[in-house]
C-alpha cells in the first residue's frame, strides 16, 4: 500500500508532481483535473483499483493517487501537509505561475512527504484526531469513468518494477557506502592498535634499558 502519485495544479495547469513508480499518471491526471470544479472542495474519486483524493482550495488542487486499500485518512493527512507547505512557500504566486514552475523545488517535498505518509511507521506518528475522522466522514467517494482521446476506456497503468529497480540501485549504493565506512573504521582501529603496541613496547624496553634514552642498552 502506498501513495503512488502526487500533483499540485491550478485547474489543469500542473505546477509540481512526483511519481513513486512508473505509469500513465499524467494522462489520467489530466482528465481528473478537468473534472474538478474550481470552488473549494474535498473529494475522493474511485476508478478500478485506485482512488484519486483531492483538496481544492483557492483554485489550487492538491491531488494524490493511491491503491484502493490505502487508508483515506492517511491520504488526506498527506494532502493537508502538502497544502500547508505549498501555501507557506509560494502563497499567491501559484495563481499566475507557468506550468511546472514549482516542480524543480517542490517535487522533492512531494517525494519526501509521499514516502513518509506511505510508510507504516509514519502512520503511528501522524495523530488522527476525532475532528479529522469526522471531517473524513463528510468527504464523498464517487466512481469516475475515464475516456482516452481516441474514445476507448482509459485505465491507470502502473509499473512498480521501475520503483523496484530504483530501490535496488539505492540498496546497492547504500551497501557499498556501508562497506566503505566499515573498511575505514577497521583501518583506523588497526592503526590505533599498532600505535598502542609500539608505545607499550617502547615503555617496556625503556624500563629494561634504564630510561627513555635506553642508556644501558645503547653503546656510546
From Swiss-Prot:
Its main location: membrane. Disulfide bonds: none annotated. Residues 2-188 are cytoplasmic. It is a single-pass type IV membrane protein. GO terms for biological process: calcium-ion regulated exocytosis; endoplasmic reticulum to Golgi vesicle-mediated transport; endosome to lysosome transport; eosinophil degranulation; exocytosis; neutrophil degranulation; phagocytosis, engulfment; protein transport. One of its GO terms (molecular function) is SNAP receptor activity. The chain crosses the membrane at residues 189-209. Signal peptide: none annotated. Residues 210-220 are vesicular. Keywords: Coiled coil, Cytoplasmic vesicle, Endoplasmic reticulum, Endosome, Golgi apparatus, Lysosome, Membrane, Protein transport, Signal-anchor, Synapse, Synaptosome, Transmembrane, Transmembrane helix, Transport. It comes from the Eukaryota. It holds the Pfam family Synaptobrevin. Belongs to the synaptobrevin family. This is Vesicle-associated membrane protein 7.
